[in-house]
Amino acid sequence: HYAQYHLSNVDLTGALKGALVTARLTSDNVLLKMTTEAEYNLAHSYPDGKVTMDVTQLDLHELGLMPQPMKHPLAFNFSAEARQNRVFTHLVSGDMKLNLSARSGVEPLIRQSTHFVDVLMRQIDEKALDHAELREALPTAILSFSAGKENPLAYFLATQNISYQDASMKFGTAPDWGINGKAAIHTLKVDTLQLDTIFFTVKQDTTSMKLRAGVINGPKNPQFVFRSTLTGEIRSEDAELTVNYVDGKGQTGVLFGVNARPLTEGHGKGNGVLLNLTPAEPVIAYRKFHFVDNSNWIYLHNNMRVYANIDMDSDNG
């Protein structure tokens, strides 16, 4: 029983043939209609098995997990497989797809991921990033996601008065090509607000990691037209971030950034973070400025003291 429901037609079977364990679980009732099959090979020292789950109806509202019903009950197909040199998962629900694959078994993947984190944390402690070393420590894996308007994510967001045209994401890691990926959402509507395109990209080479994100509203947007971007770059010994805003008339409203460089030499040569404001002629609230005599820095000492030398003049007086 679950609440007022009498759950019937639930069946579990299993078998052992040699070293292969198999199991099958089925459910056919008002709350859950599904079939799950799994197998696992006990003969190997590494995880070796797979599972598939086909859910044709799962009512989250009736289960008390959602305050109001969605457009359709939850239905999805999920499969996962772990072999000696491969890990793969696949989820499909309506027009939503999620895939994760790696060119290694479960245990090597965990070891590689842990090693990458250790290398990254050591470099952060040393305040100097070696992107070539970071790339060598990366596991080879790909994560991808895509969704339209007919899937549980869209149905749930609709209950919150949020909608979108489509969403997609693909990120990959490998020693050969580093960390690369992109993500985008088109025609995102929240109540009366509409954002035409939201995007994010990342690309790593042997010397740096470049990041770019932004929001773009095209000429047909019912509210306002603009392009706003964040551009960043993480290099070996410094990082930079710039924000740029251009309105529908092509006029720059904001162009402003900061460069951050750790100073670690000590003995009067620095022990903190030096921030340099960029570019040489920033734009703030549609007004162009310039820094007088290179007065564009802020120094954050590790002893919590702050030193600054900023002098900006506007070209408009």
Feature names for model-found ranges:
Residues 1-317:
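Interface amphipathic segments
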